[in-house]
Curated annotation (Swiss-Prot):
Binds 1 Mg(2+) ion per subunit. This is Anthranilate synthase component 1 1. Tetramer of two components I and two components II. Pathway: Amino-acid biosynthesis; L-tryptophan biosynthesis; L-tryptophan from chorismate: step 1/5. Belongs to the anthranilate synthase component I family. Its EC number is 4.1.3.27. Residues 288-309 are annotated as: Disordered. The lineage of its organism: Archaea, Methanobacteriati, Methanobacteriota, Stenosarchaea group, Halobacteria. It catalyses: chorismate + L-glutamine = anthranilate + pyruvate + L-glutamate + H(+).
Length: 489
């Protein structure tokens, strides 16, 4: 049963005082058993976006379907962040009493290779996939819910008509109410099935672009650069590929069960689908407050609680992990400092341990206050790409990454972003993410290399990080999926 929470008078009073181009939310509520099942019911042939947030954003999750607008930027065009700003420009939101952080907004992803527009980088890595630098869609309505949730959840469906698109505020209200009711009904009553994947195969083996030995060579090359003083730490990755034998919706449905993560997302976009279990926040902006949450330091999960505790103690006591984490926190402090008011940058949470299904991580929180005149675009440019998935110093380390990795990263270590129409934004770092492109799943996994890194240990860390994604495809297929690169020679 749907209930309309925004009355006509409240809406028209807000609209009367608002800027003509402003959007005013109309809220409808509906109870559902599971938000992702509701998304499956509501999505159509155009796909949609689902952001399963269990951390950040005060514990809110969102989904959107039927985008009102879409933009894509080719890498050869340049100006990616400016194009994103242009896409968001002109949007205003008058929220009134609506406390949903994002009642409407835009969702998109930025390629790691946007870094080539921010720094002068070589073109050593092969651009073997014709992927864009940006895909972003605008949603005039969202379904939102608060985490954690019980056995059932109340979806708060908000439609945000633009006042000047209608002859009167009353007409805008009626449109918004109907628009919200349509999504609420679809979420409660639609067909949750998805179309079959385009690939029909009994094989879903992930194969790497390098062997254990060639990955070790990458690590040794980076260690030589460290000895030469070019870098202190660098994130080195390998790319895994498998036929796209399961639909992204099915893969995400399994992934959210086997490895729930605070910045997970499913993006179904033209030509590219992202299935992400990212645990890492690149940037959150709310008013003038900005923050980032660097992750540096990893251990596998133990088989028992006692083993877990021993591994956590080992992680906290490890001098290599301690030094690497401190260095990267300092890097993020410096990045935020580029756009923050003097003296406002601080570390509010240092070296906590977060546990996930396959691994545990060291995490810190760095905060600042955006200086007067600095924009969201400035803030993104200051922190992008994240220091934890490049290294320190960042520009030189990105040059080294481009040299040692065989192919361009694409979405990996780029960002998935949720952008509000009031300047609010939340961007993750694209790690632990399946990318479906050209009937294949691509999965990149990396490890931070420092002066005393052991190549075999770093290689194993990449496998540990990729395991949850492989398990999700395994569960979706209902059979064993091999991580074949473990045995490659």
């Amino acid at each position: 049963m749907q209930s309309v929470e925004t009355d006509r008078t409240t809406f028209t009073d807000l609209a009367a005082d608002a800027h003509p181009a402003a959007r005013v939310p109309v809220e409808v509520r509906v109870d559902v058993d599971d938000p992702f099942l509701a998304y499956r019911r509501a999505r159509d042939e155009t796909g949609g976006v689902y952001l399963a947030t269990t951390g950040g954003q005060s514990g809110w999750g969102y989904f959107g379907t039927a985008p009102a607008d879409f933009r894509e930027v080719d890498p050869r065009a340049g100006g990616t962040l400016a194009a994103l700003t242009e896409f968001l420009d002109g949007e205003r939101l008058v929220r009134g009493d609506c406390d949903v952080p994002y009642p409407c907004g835009a969702v998109g992803w930025l390629s790691y290779d946007v870094a080539r527009e921010l720094e002068s980088l070589p073109d050593s890595a092969d651009a073997d996939r014709a992927l864009p630098n940006l895909q972003v869609a605008r949603y005039d309505r969202f379904a939102a819910w608060e985490e954690p949730r019980g056995e059932s959840v109340t979806l708060r469906v908000t439609a945000c008509p633009r006042v000047d698109d209608f002859e009167t505020p009353e007409l805008a209200y009626e449109f918004g109410k109907q628009h919200a009711l349509d999504l609420a009904r679809a979420a409660a009553q639609g067909d949750p099935s998805v179309e079959d994947p385009p690939v029909e195969t009994d094989e879903a083996t992930f194969e790497s672009d390098c062997t254990r030995e060639s990955f070790a060579d990458r690590v040794q090359t980076v260690k030589q650069y460290i000895r030469d003083g070019d870098t202190f730490q660098a994130n080195v990755s390998q790319r895994l590929r498998a036929p796209a034998a399961v639909h992204p919706v099915e893969a995400f449905d399994a992934l959210r069960t086997v490895n729930p993560a605070p910045y997970s997302a499913l993006l179904e976009f033209p030509g590219v689908d992202l299935v992400s279990a990212s645990p890492e926040l690149l940037l959150h902006r709310d008013g003038d407050r900005i923050e980032t949450e660097p992750i540096a330091g990893t251990r596998p999960r133990g088989e028992t609680p006692d083993a877990d505790d021993r591994l956590e103690t080992d992680l906290l006591d490890d001098e290599k992990e301690r030094a690497e984490h401190a260095m990267l926190v300092d890097l993020e402090r410096n990045d935020l400092g580029k756009v923050s008011k003097f003296g406002s940058v601080e570390v509010s949470d240092y070296r906590r341990v977060d546990r996930y299904s396959e691994v545990m991580h060291l995490v810190s929180v760095v905060e600042g206050r955006l200086r007067d005149g600095a924009s969201l675009q400035d803030a993104i440019a200051a922190v992008f790409p994240g220091g934890t998935i490049t290294g320190a110093p960042k520009p030189r380390t990105m040059e080294i990454i481009d040299e040692v990795e065989a192919t361009r990263r694409g979405p990996y270590t780029g960002s998935i972003g949720l952008f509000g129409f009031d300047g609010r934004a939340t961007l993750n770092i694209v790690i632990r993410t399946l990318v479906r492109y050209a009937e294949e799943y691509h999965l990149r996994v990396g490890a931070g290399v420092v002066h005393d890194s052991d190549p075999d240990r770093e290689y194993q860390e990449t496998l540990d990080k990729g395991r949850a994604l492989v398990n999700a495809v395994d569960e979706a297929l209902g059979r064993r999926v091999d991580l074949a690169m473990e045995d490659q020679q």
